[in-house]
Amino acid sequence: MDARRNKRFIVSLEAELILKDVRIASSIENLSEEGAYVITASSKLFSDFAPDTCIELKFQLPSGEKQRLNCRVKWSYKTPPHGLTNSIGMQIIDPPLSYKESLKALI
């Protein structure tokens, strides 16, 4: 049984993670009203993706609407077998109504 509260939308969106003053190119694999699953290239900053780390997620929806969401890392790991990418699950902190409405348009 799936314990998720919100429906996830499978997407493939270019994004940018902003952590302190560092910008990290990434790809969003799925989105929900309150969460995101993101993949980044492996980096020395992996330790900065520890649970509870606050991070900004910046991307553009297919509609053209730009989003900047404040997020909290829930989990992260280096993707096996070689650790060439990082997988990161994030909780969206106080998702704006405009984001929620735009997400519904992806259906």
Where do the language-model regions lie?
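Short coil/turn motifs at beta-sheet boundaries
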Residues: R8, L31, A50-D52, G64-K66, ...
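Short beta-strand-centered aromatic/proline hotspots
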Residues: A25-I28, L69-S76
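N-terminal helix initiation/capping motif
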Residues: M1-A41, K104-I107
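Short conserved beta-strand and strand-loop elements enriched in small hydrophobics
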Residues: L13-I18, A50-K66
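C-terminal output/interaction extensions
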Residues: P80-I107
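Short beta-strands and strand-coil junctions in structured, solvent-facing domains, enriched
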Residues: K44-F46, T79
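A structural micro-motif recognizing beta-strand termini
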Residues: I39-K44, I93
